[in-house]
């Protein structure tokens, strides 16, 4: 009676499994066999229809092209027809991957095209064998689908005779490797097997689930709690009975955790300060929008990448990597960070990140951009210096210029009373140096003392020409070529002529001094925009070091042995008063270009 346990098992679980075998497995396998058999036939039929459609397309595209090049010798005509028809077969086979197609000419007894030509171009001009099915197609004027070995190999070949005006001119073929067809049929078989297997497994699984309902519900809750530890969004399904109450309590707990985490994420996302977190390996794990704005890097560029790649080629020492490697935490540390497009002044605070077990899993850096604040502080300090300078210059004008005037008068009297050439030369030097001191004092006064601008209509081209007259002395013209490219269509602008002339003169003198031997200076004017005009002064002198380009507009900054360092500072102030912009572009050894952008009609009259 032992075998009766298998024929009629006592346990419900085994009975359900037996029923599944009788009610699911046998019908499923039977249906699968029928579907597989019919599917293979359907695949073959579909392939035949597709190949027939391809040859019909080729036949329509052929038209009367076989009548071309009749007077050419056989080989030349084959090449000419191939050049004419190859694009057609290439386009068709490109549209139907895996298919080979071509034309055969009965008169020439040769293959005209065989696409794709990258694979079968060497078959062009070949004559098919006497027993080739294509000859039967041409002889009987009947389409034929043939499966077997031909020029390409084992293929399913659809052939169509080319008939024009009752005459057979050749045939067209389209074929596909039977291996590709078998592979497709095998894929279909695999899918059927997978579906059948999945269906059987699902059926058995359902039976097992029903037979072990209580234990399954417990497993769901247990597995859900385990998953919840790593993935808070996990939600347990609603279960019946007491298990449902437990699952609902777990879901409520998960919801509370989700809301807490969401709040934390929102705080980080909307923080004005940049936040970047890295793991133990130094790879970026988190980056908020403020960090993107400050550093210039996008989140998708950095997350998952080493944080150190931001400054691989620099001498920058990272506080957050120091925290990660040595445990040193920094608070409000001011650093210069190498951003994407610029060096950024930052206030940085770093800390370690620990998990619930107290183990360090990474480091966090919170930073704010101090660049604007630093620039504001610098400008305020500069303004204070200038205010102090203004007060100082008022005293200098009286305390220094008056004695200098007296000294100059006495020196002139001495020069008039002496006839000694040496004394005359010495006194001339004294007068020249006194005038130089007076000029420096005058520049300081002009820079520190407000001046009411004289606004009028000014032609930039005329202004450039007037200024060049002052610069093009005989000595300068001997070594510097001046090239003027002035836009004659420019209309006058509203500006202070004398102040703009002073700006041009300052820049041109600097350009001349930057050229040590022979060189050239190019001056251009053009319409910068509908409301702005521009002047550029370009020289091929020594250029300006990148580290100095931000300083050249600072008062008293100069790299020359002589000079006050006020020329460009005053020029910038004049251009700003015109509501314009002054820009510099330079590379050491390649010269410099200063560009002045001026509005045609500034809003209001500014005082310089």
UniProtKB/Swiss-Prot annotation:
PAC domain: residues covered: 326-382
Transmembrane keyword on record: yes
A Pfam family reported for this protein in Swiss-Prot or TrEMBL: HisKA
Membrane topology: Multi-pass membrane protein
Keyword entries, A-Z: ATP-binding, Cell inner membrane, Cell membrane, Kinase, Membrane, Nucleotide-binding, Phosphoprotein, Transferase, Transmembrane, Transmembrane helix, Two-component regulatory system
TM segment ranges: 16-36, 190-210
Leading EC class: transferase
Domain of life: Bacteria
SUPFAM superfamilies: ATPase domain of HSP90 chaperone/DNA topoisomerase II/histidine kinase, Homodimeric domain of signal transducing histidine kinase, PYP-like sensor domain (PAS domain)
Subunit and interaction comment: Homodimer.
Designated name of the protein: Signal transduction histidine-protein kinase AtoS
């Amino acid at each position: 009676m032992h075998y009766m346990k298998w024929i009629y098992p006592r346990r419900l679980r085994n009975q359900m499994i037996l029923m599944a075998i009788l009610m699911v497995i046998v019908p499923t396998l039977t249906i699968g066999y029928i579907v597989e058999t019919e599917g293979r036939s359907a695949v073959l039929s579909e392939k035949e229809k597709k190949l027939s459609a391809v040859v019909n397309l080729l036949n329509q595209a052929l038209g009367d092209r076989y009548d071309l090049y009749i007077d050419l010798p056989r080989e030349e005509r084959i090449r000419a027809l191939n050049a004419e028809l190859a694009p057609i077969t290439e386009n068709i086979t490109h549209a139907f991957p895996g298919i080979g197609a071509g034309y055969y000419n009965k008169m020439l007894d040769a293959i005209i095209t065989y696409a794709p030509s990258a694979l079968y171009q060497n078959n062009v001009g070949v004559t098919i064998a006497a027993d080739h099915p294509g000859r039967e197609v041409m002889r009987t004027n009947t389409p034929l689908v043939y499966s077997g070995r031909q020029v390409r190999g084992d293929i399913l070949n659809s052939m169509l005779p080319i008939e024009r005006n009752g005459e057979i001119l050749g045939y067209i073929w389209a074929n596909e490797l039977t291996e590709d067809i078998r592979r497709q049929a095998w894929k279909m078989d695999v899918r059927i097997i997978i579906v059948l297997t999945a269906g059987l497994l699902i059926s058995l699984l359902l039976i097992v689930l029903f037979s072990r309902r209580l234990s399954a519900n417990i497993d769901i809750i247990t597995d859900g709690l385990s998953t919840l530890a790593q993935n808070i969004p996990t939600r347990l399904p609603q279960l019946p009975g007491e298990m449902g109450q437990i699952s609902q309590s777990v879901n409520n707990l998960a919801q509370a955790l989700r809301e807490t985490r969401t709040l934390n994420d929102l705080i980080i996302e909307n923080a004005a300060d940049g936040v970047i977190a890295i793991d133990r390996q130094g790879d970026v794990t988190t980056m908020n929008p403020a960090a993107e704005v400050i550093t210039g890097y996008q989140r998708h560029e950095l997350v998952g990448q080493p944080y150190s790649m931001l400054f691989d080629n620099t001498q920058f020492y990272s506080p957050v990597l120091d925290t990660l490697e040595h445990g040193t935490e920094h608070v409000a540390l001011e650093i210069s960070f190498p951003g994407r497009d610029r060096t950024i002044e930052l206030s940085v605070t770093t800390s370690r990140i620990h998990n619930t077990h107290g183990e360090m899993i990474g480091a966090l850096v919170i930073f704010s951009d101090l660049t604007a604040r630093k620039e504001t502080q610098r400008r305020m300090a500069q303004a204070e210096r200038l205010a102090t300078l203004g007060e100082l210059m008022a005293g200098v004008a009286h305390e220094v210029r008056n004695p200098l005037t007296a000294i100059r008068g006495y020196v002139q009297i001495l020069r008039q009373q002496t006839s000694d050439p040496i004394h005359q030369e010495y006194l001339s030097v004294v007068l020249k140096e006194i005038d130089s001191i007076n000029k420096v004092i005058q520049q300081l006064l002009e820079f520190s003392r407000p001046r009411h601008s004289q606004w009028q209509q000014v032609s930039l081209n005329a202004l450039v020409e007037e200024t060049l007259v002052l610069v093009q002395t005989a000595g300068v013209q001997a070594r510097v070529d001046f090239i003027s490219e002035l836009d004659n269509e420019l209309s006058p602008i509203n500006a202070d002529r004398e102040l703009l002339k002073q700006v041009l003169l300052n820049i041109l003198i600097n350009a001349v001094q930057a050229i040590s031997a022979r060189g050239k200076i190019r001056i251009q004017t053009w319409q910068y925009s509908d409301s702005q005009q521009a002047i550029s002064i370009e020289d091929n002198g020594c250029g300006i070091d990148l580290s100095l380009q931000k300083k050249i507009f600072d008062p008293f900054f100069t790299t020359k042995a002589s000079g006050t360092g006020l020329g460009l500072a005053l020029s910038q102030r004049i251009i700003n008063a015109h509501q314009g912009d002054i820009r510099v572009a330079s590379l050491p050894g390649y010269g410099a270009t200063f560009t002045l952008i001026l509005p045609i009609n500034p809003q209001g009259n500014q005082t310089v």
